[in-house]
Amino acid sequence: MNTRGCVNNNKMIFMNALGLQPQSKLKIIAHKILEKCKRDAYTRFKGVKAIKNELKTYNLTLQQYNEALNQCALNDSRWRDTNNWHHDIEEGVKINKRHIYRVNFNSKTQEIEEYYYIKVECYVNS
């Protein structure tokens, strides 16, 4: 009878034979969070808030939290770069307030710098 430990050992032998490495715990956490949040359409910085709240549910140190947030930013940009269109049909004006969130991750110190931008794009029909 095979136990889970035996099955996991067989998987590791197979992965090592192919030269593959198992994913880190933080990459798996980031992937789970992005899968959970990918079906939502976010406006403004609500996607950033949702991802951060999901990360807080895991018992991570500050360095692990920062690295997982960076992994989320690298793997998917839908939650951190949103379009918020406003159409004024009478005036023929379309205004888009893009809310952009960027993460600068320092791998040596495991610290992040967060940047929040609002970019206004205006299109006028003449």
Curated annotation (Swiss-Prot):
It is found in: Virion. Its main location: virion. Keywords: Capsid protein, Virion. One of its GO terms (cellular component) is viral capsid. This is Putative 15 kDa capsid protein.
